[in-house]
């Protein structure tokens, strides 16, 4: 079967990961000890995408958990689903990365990385036909960003032909956890552009907004935010785990979504999102799902798709529904909002239909869009980076771990290049000659 190896790193990654396994366990009818409690044969049919079956009939997640301090791991282990993971797959240090990318990437993380890679190899050898890796981490801290990107580049060396999918939590525009977030995020993006195949961009502020505005939660906790993320994560891989009329996998997703190799940062959304109280007053229909799924308020990162254009998009529907209706709705969206799609990629929305809905819903959909407006995220981080870097603020923490200022300059220019590439394709039209591009690029860079 096409297995996926799940890796979670740092506090944020481990908390998202924990929630994700709760969701996947519920979908496959597996209880917190790894026993199967479900009632539907389909739950077990391809359970080995995410689980290994142990000799005693228990299902063990194909998960590698890493962190540079024991805190989050301890609370994970004592939590409801703590007993389900294989004990050897917890890899942690004692010192912590202290929100310092250099510690995660070059010093503390580098000491721990070999033991993580051993676990990854063991898990990969357990697979019949490994499809790829999914990594949960944040880009603002030290471990998820520094050590996470180190692990991604090492895995890339060892498994160059396997898909590498990341769920990356970007620093939020208004809410900041640490002062050095812009540094950590820029250094991470520099790595992700080169070494990841697909990055799902998330950020806390957009998730707070969804909890606040749509779900009507007055004081959303990280648990609520992570629940949103895990619903999306489960939606991305549902076709691998359950039978469907139109299947897709990580590679098909990449082929359909990535027109240019560097532009692989996606916005994600999930529908239906309704507040707990008003759920019973609504019947779900494909048009309703589609409408909510394409809504800008539904995007889990703080960039507005209306400020850019979609290069490509993918919609994954789950539940019993007619593919004809799905196709009609997708064509409808493209026709009504044609100005928001680039005209030089015709039919740029791929749809997937999986027959089994998520737990507790009749139908649901997951949205993944490759929109040029994601540059807003990069631009914002880049501005904050430049403001601090110009004065060399906080740099001694990084140079003290052996980093060079040159690396910062490279990361900064790579990020700015990424922004101007998005801008260039946003402005491009179908009938231009190649010559005009070059002028445009120069203009674009001056604007930027």
Curated annotation (Swiss-Prot):
GO terms for cellular component: cytoplasm; microtubule. Keywords: Cytoplasm, Cytoskeleton, GTP-binding, Magnesium, Metal-binding, Microtubule, Nucleotide-binding. GTP binds at residues 11, 69, 138, 142-144, 204, 226. It is found in: Cytoplasm, Cytoskeleton. Gene3D superfamilies: Helix hairpin bin (1.10.287.600), Tubulin/FtsZ, C-terminal domain (3.30.1330.20), Tubulin/FtsZ, GTPase domain (3.40.50.1440). GO terms for molecular function: GTP binding; GTPase activity; metal ion binding; structural constituent of cytoskeleton. Belongs to the tubulin family. This is Tubulin beta-2 chain.
């Amino acid at each position: 079967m096409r297995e996926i190896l799940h890796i979670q790193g740092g506090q944020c990654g481990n908390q998202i990961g924990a929630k994700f396994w709760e969701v996947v366990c519920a979908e496959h009818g597996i209880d917190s000890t790894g026993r199967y409690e479900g009632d539907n044969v389909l739950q077990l049919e391809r359970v080995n995408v995410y689980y290994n079956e142990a000799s005693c009939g228990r299902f063990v997640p194909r998960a590698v958990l890493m962190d540079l301090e024991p805190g989050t791991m301890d609370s994970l282990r004592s939590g409801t689903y703590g007993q389900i993971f294989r004990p050897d797959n917890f890899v942690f240090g004692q010192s912590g990365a202290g929100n310092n990318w250099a510690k995660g990437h070059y010093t503390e993380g580098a000491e721990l990385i070999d033991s993580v890679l051993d676990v990854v190899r063991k898990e990969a050898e357990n697979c019949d036909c490994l499809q790829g890796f999914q990594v949960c981490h944040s880009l603002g801290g030290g471990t998820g960003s520094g050590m996470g990107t180190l692990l991604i580049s090492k895995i890339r060396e060892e498994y160059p032909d396997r898909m590498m999918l990341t769920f990356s939590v970007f620093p939020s525009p208004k809410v900041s956890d640490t002062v050095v977030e812009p540094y950590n995020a820029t250094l991470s993006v520099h790595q992700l552009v080169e070494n990841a195949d697909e990055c799902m961009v998330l950020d806390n502020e957009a998730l707070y907004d969804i909890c606040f505005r749509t779900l009507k939660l007055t004081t959303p906790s990280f648990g609520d935010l992570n629940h949103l993320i895990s619903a999306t994560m489960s939606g991305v891989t549902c076709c691998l785990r359950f039978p469907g009329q139109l299947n897709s996998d990580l590679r098909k997703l990449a082929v359909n979504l990535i027109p240019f190799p560097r532009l692989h940062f996606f916005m994600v959304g999930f529908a239906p999102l309704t507040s707990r109280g008003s759920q019973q007053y609504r019947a779900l229909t494909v048009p309703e799902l589609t409408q909510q799924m394409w809504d800008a308020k539904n995007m889990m990162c703080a960039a507005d798709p209306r400020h850019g254009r979609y290069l490509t998009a993918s919609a994954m529907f789950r539940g019993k529904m007619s593919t004809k209706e799905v196709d009609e709705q997708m064509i409808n969206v493209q026709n009504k909002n044609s100005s928001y799609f680039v005209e030089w990629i015709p039919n740029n929305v791929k749809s997937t239909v999986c027959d089994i809905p998520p737990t507790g819903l009749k139908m649901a959909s997951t949205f993944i869009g490759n929109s040029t407006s994601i540059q807003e995220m990069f631009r914002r981080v880049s501005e904050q980076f430049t403001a601090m870097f110009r004065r060399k603020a906080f740099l001694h923490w990084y140079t003290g771990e052996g980093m060079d200022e040159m690396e910062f300059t490279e990361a900064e220019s790579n990020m700015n290049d990424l922004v101007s590439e998005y801008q260039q394709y946003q402005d491009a039209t179908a009938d231009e000659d190649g010559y005009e591009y070059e002028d445009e690029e120069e203009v674009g860079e001056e604007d930027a």
